[in-house]
């Protein structure tokens, strides 16, 4: 269950008016949802509730799983200082260890409907802020 209004309220409660966020995520967040209503989508609600201006960075389409898997694995293998806090992020660690792919290489969320969502967040983060890593790495290696 996700309640975007509660999430925004929790962010406001934690940070007040003293914050600068850059928001990214799933391209499907641009879709209207029956859960939201009023012809809104999640990103419009986030922008309005958090009073954001130009801090929204959402791809037109989600990255392909196979491409983001290569990017994610490359970042972890080439940046050994990239560490995920085991105490603070136990569910992300579990996703990274145990989420499986289906025959077409996509995350198999049918095996466990509670797994895979946080690895998606990590994929979207890497895709939004580090998508040029492989190109830069390959250029530096030449």
Q: Can you say where each PLM-predicted feature lies in the sequence?
A:
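Mg2+-dependent endonuclease catalytic cores in nucleic-acid-processing enzymes, primarily RNase H-like
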Residues: 1-109, 132-133, 139
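Short, hydrophobic alpha-helical segments
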Residues: 125-133
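Intrinsic low-complexity, intrinsically disordered terminal tails and linker regions enriched
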Residues: 118, 141-142
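Phosphate/NTP-binding elements of NTP-utilizing enzymes
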Residues: 21-25, 108, 116-126
């Amino acid at each position: 269950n996700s309640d975007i209004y509660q999430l925004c309220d929790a962010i406001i409660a934690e940070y007040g008016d003293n914050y600068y966020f850059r928001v990214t995520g799933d391209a499907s967040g641009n879709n209207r949802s029956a859960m939201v209503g009023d012809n809104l989508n999640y990103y419009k609600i986030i922008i309005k509730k958090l009073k954001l201006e130009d801090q929204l960075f959402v791809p037109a389409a989600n990255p392909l799983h196979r491409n983001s898997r290569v990017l994610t694995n490359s970042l972890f293998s080439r940046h050994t200082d990239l560490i995920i806090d085991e105490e603070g992020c136990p569910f992300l660690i579990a996703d990274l260890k145990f989420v499986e792919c289906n025959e077409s290489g996509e995350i198999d969320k049918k095996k466990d409907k509670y797994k895979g969502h946080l690895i998606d967040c990590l994929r979207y983060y890497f895709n939004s802020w580090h998508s040029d890593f492989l190109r830069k790495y390959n250029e530096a290696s030449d």
